[in-house]
Amino acid sequence: MTHDKTCPCGSPKIYQDCCQILHLGLDSGAQLATSPEQLMRSRYCAFVLKNFDYIIKTHHAAYLDGLTLEQLQQGPHPEWLGLDVLSANDTTQPDGSKFGTVTFKAWYKMSGEIDAIYERSEFIFEQGRWFYTKGHQMHAKLPGRNDPCVCHSGKKFKQCCMKG
């Protein structure tokens, strides 16, 4: 990743000042995501960069359902186009436990077709950090020809990613 590019998570910051801090700080505990949204954005960025170790380590072990690092590495891997966070929240229960949700669309291209993962992800705060637990999939509708492009280029969809 070049130093002059904004972070894939959609932040205006460069990767080194954004998600890389979380990617590198996870094992040491030096820098952890402070909210479900920040964790979700850093996980999206990890998918873009194929940092599958981060994906596994931020996925709650009780919810992995047999998912392994090797499976993630196998592919095929899409070309990630952009991320739209639609809503995010976290709540603290009376017993002190914390839960959160993030609803997002992660746009990608695979085999020449554009699609999105449209999901309401669930998160839990345990052992001093946030973990992804599971997601509820929804159907994503492609933007109209004259709508802004999913890659956030500022161009119309028909003049950008829709072209091919």
From Swiss-Prot:
Domain of life: Bacteria
NCBIfam families found in the cross-reference section: PRK01752.1
PANTHER family (alphabetical): ADENYLATE CYCLASE-ASSOCIATED CAP C-TERMINAL DOMAIN-CONTAINING PROTEIN, UPF0225 PROTEIN SCO1677
Family that this chain belongs to: Belongs to the UPF0225 family.
The protein's name in its UniProt record: UPF0225 protein Shewana3_2159
Species the sequence originates in: Shewanella sp. (strain ANA-3)
